[in-house]
């Protein structure tokens, strides 16, 4: 049997396992997740040793290093997250809509699982736990394609998950970790009939790869080219704090600030807006007006003149660009040209300007006078998320349990037949 044939055979097993999840009651699903959380401490040494092998192959200066890193504190946090998912209300079998037709037919629209969800992701072994928990809670089976840089970690984690599933008398094929090789991704992306949807989580390059090569439906998540516009009516102290938070809180995540847009009438305030970033060694790529305003007031080694490509980059690190504009319209045009439609923000006190920005910006989350760091399922009160959808079909914004479900119509009659 070739590797391709072996993978397809395993995908068939996952599809079969997905049908066994549907009749499981809520107590069974929640009990599995809680036991998995309880078993993490005993498995920690094996998981951390596997993670150490992955880390040894990566330069600590690589922006992906922090995302790859697991430690005791992060494992404890993962266990807490698993318990939190278990405590969430089930999204399954909810009556979303119901009506009785004039002919007496009774219709109910009820929530159901998507089926088998394929996840492609990079450098984040915690995602392995997160995705399994969310997929199981929403009644879905999971096929994972992690990056080769997290191969050892992912194997150790999936081994633990499958052990817990097996120990509870359930089918361990409800989760499957594909080989780390790139060819496995191509098989997954074209597994029509076995995979119901693909969700890529990672860089824009990864998302583009999935969209280009997949014959399975794809929900795009993750990539964020995030802007914050400081308007001529913006409060300076508020702007300083928001910019600092949006850029430095967690620079490697998709809701981190990439480009600060500043109204030219506030160019003299630019040093106050960004000087606090110096303490975090944030590198700034500034257009000409911003560059000369910051020259001598921001460290020379952290300040460069921007080139065009800096305004379409998701930095995922302690880097950002600055663009000056002469009007709200110019700011909106810049965002429309470069945005990935993830998260965009305005800092302003003029309500007319705020309303125009909120109405005209096309993004999954649009903010006024707050940090884009809040684009997160838990922060939105939705519970854990599987990603941030940047498209408009099926789901948009944080994809929590409800977004991992579809629906079907249940139609009950008393012998009616259609005559027209």
From Swiss-Prot:
It is an enzyme of class 1 (oxidoreductase). Signal peptide: none annotated. Pathway: Amino-acid biosynthesis; L-proline biosynthesis; L-glutamate 5-semialdehyde from L-glutamate: step 2/2. One of its GO terms (cellular component) is cytoplasm. It comes from the Bacteria. The keyword Oxidoreductase applies. It catalyses: L-glutamate 5-semialdehyde + phosphate + NADP(+) = L-glutamyl 5-phosphate + NADPH + H(+). One of its GO terms (molecular function) is NADP binding. It is found in: Cytoplasm. GO terms for biological process: L-proline biosynthetic process. Keywords: Amino-acid biosynthesis, Cytoplasm, NADP, Oxidoreductase, Proline biosynthesis. SUPFAM superfamilies: ALDH-like (SSF53720). Pfam families: Aldedh. InterPro entries: Ald_DH/histidinol_DH, Ald_DH_C, Ald_DH_N, Aldehyde_DH_dom, G-glutamylP_reductase_CS, Glu-5-SA_DH, GPR_dom. Its EC number is 1.2.1.41. HAMAP family: ProA. Belongs to the gamma-glutamyl phosphate reductase family. NCBIfam families: PRK00197.1, proA. Catalyzes the NADPH-dependent reduction of L-glutamate 5-phosphate into L-glutamate 5-semialdehyde and phosphate. The product spontaneously undergoes cyclization to form 1-pyrroline-5-carboxylate. This is Gamma-glutamyl phosphate reductase.
């Amino acid at each position: 049997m070739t590797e391709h044939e072996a993978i397809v055979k395993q995908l068939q097993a996952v599809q079969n396992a997905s049908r066994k999840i549907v009749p499981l009651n809520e107590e069974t699903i929640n009990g599995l997740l809680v036991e998995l959380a309880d078993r993490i401490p005993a498995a920690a040494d094996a998981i951390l040793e596997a993670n150490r092998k992955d880390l040894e192959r990566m330069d600590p200066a690589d922006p992906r290093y922090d995302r790859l890193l697991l430690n005791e504190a992060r494992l404890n946090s993962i266990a807490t997250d698993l318990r939190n998912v278990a405590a969430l209300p089930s999204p399954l079998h909810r009556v979303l809509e119901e009506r009785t037709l004039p002919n007496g037919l009774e219709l109910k629209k009820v929530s159901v699982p998507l089926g088998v969800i394929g996840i492609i992701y990079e450098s984040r072994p915690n995602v392995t736990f997160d995705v399994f928990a969310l997929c199981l809670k929403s009644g879905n089976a999971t096929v994972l394609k992690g990056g080769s840089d997290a191969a050892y970690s992912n194997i150790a984690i999936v081994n633990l998950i499958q052990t817990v599933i097996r120990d509870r008398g359930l089918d361990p094929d409800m989760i499957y970790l594909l080989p780390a090789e790139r060819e496995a991704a191509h098989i997954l992306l074209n597994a029509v009939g076995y995979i119901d949807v693909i969700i890529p989580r990672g860089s824009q390059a990864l998302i583009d790869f999935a969209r280009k090569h997949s014959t399975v439906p794809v929900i795009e998540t993750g990539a964020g080219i995030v802007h914050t516009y400081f308007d001529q009516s913006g409060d300076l102290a508020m702007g300083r704090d928001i910019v600092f938070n949006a850029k430095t809180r967690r620079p490697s995540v998709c809701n981190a600030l990439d480009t600060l847009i500043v109204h030219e009438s506030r160019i003299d305030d630019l040093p106050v807006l960004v000087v606090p970033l110096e303490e975090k060694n944030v590198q700034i790529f500034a257009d000409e007006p911003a560059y000369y305003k910051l020259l001598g007031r921001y460290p020379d080694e952290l300040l460069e003149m921007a080139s065009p490509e800096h305004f379409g980059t998701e930095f995922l690190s302690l880097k950002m660009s600055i663009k000056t504009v002469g009007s709200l319209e110019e700011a909106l045009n810049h965002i429309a040209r470069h945005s990935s439609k993830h998260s965009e923000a305005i800092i302003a006190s003029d309500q007319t300007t705020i309303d125009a920005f909120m109405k005209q910006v096309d993004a999954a989350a649009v903010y006024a006078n707050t940090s884009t760091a809040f684009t997160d399922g838990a922060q939105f009160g939705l519970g854990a998320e599987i990603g941030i959808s940047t498209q408009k079909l099926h789901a948009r914004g944080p994809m929590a349990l409800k977004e991992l479900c579809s629906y079907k119509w249940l139609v009950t009659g008393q012998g009616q037949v259609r005559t027209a």
